[in-house]
Amino acid sequence: MPPSLNPYQKAKIRVTEKRSELQKFFYAAGDLVAFAGRFFRDVLKPPYEWREILYQCFLVGYKSTFLIGLTGFIMGAVLTIQTRPSMAQFGAISMIPGMISVSVVREIGPVITALICCGKIGSRMGAELGSMKVTEQIDAMEVSAINPFRYLVVTRTLATILMVPLLTIYSDLIALFGGYLAMNIHDTSTLRHFFVAAMSHLEFIDVFPAIIKTFFFGFVVGLIGCYKGWNARRGTESVGMAANSAVVASSLAVFVIDMLAAQITDLLV
């Protein structure tokens, strides 16, 4: 039987394991930064794969409208139903449209939309590129004089950068409509009156930062999804690992960007 380890030796092993994990984290972060640098280098060089960019926009945008719309509708309806009793106690029913619009536009809409894109789009890109890496299709593209990075990574990342803001606006509008229907369960309000009241509470400082950060959300969703798939190891199980890690890493990046955006907006106000 192997000799038992004393507490000092056990602690030393744990520290060594943690240090190894920390080194892997910083190595992956540096590799991701280099991957992003390669993206910015290639995205500024024409010609562009317009056909592939439009096709990826179709997959990212149009194919996600039902899920994004359904989520936005439920989000707006639940927010209205949950807050109405508290607002009614203070006689502030008329403030519900403004409260919903500010909450959805500033924070809930962009973040929820980005997280859905992480799960639906980021995982698809990670699995798709991971499968191509495992089956050596990327190597075949390099041999055939096609730039695989430009064709696979640049097009997909540009599509997410362009479509996530549009999906966010779409989700916000559907959420307001869901809030309107939920409000009419107990109260009577016209659609025009509800939207006028909702928009009257929105200011430039509410809308502009929310739209700007969605471009960054789209960037990290596309880039991290492609990065995980591009660096998948040989073997079929690595495809699933690439898809899973793409969702986790991009979701974490969304929360970090959202926190930084909130701090910057607070400093500018």
Model-derived features: positions:
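Active-site cofactor/substrate anionic-group-binding motifs, chiefly glycine-
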Residues: 58-112, 116
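Short cytoplasmic-facing helical segments at TM-TM junctions of multi-pass membrane proteins
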Residues: 129-154, 236-239
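Hydrophobic alpha-helical transmembrane segments of multi-pass membrane transport proteins
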Residues: 96-139, 167, 224
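Short, membrane-interfacial amphipathic segments enriched in basic
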Residues: 7-52, 228-229, 233
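Hydrophobic alpha-helical transmembrane segments that constitute the membrane-spanning cores
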Residues: 71-74, 114, 154-183, 216, ...
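Membrane-interfacial helix-loop-helix connectors in multipass membrane proteins
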Residues: 82-105, 173-215, 219, 223-243, ...
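Selective transmembrane-helix segments that form parts of the transport pathway or gating/packing helices
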Residues: 61, 65, 69, 108, ...
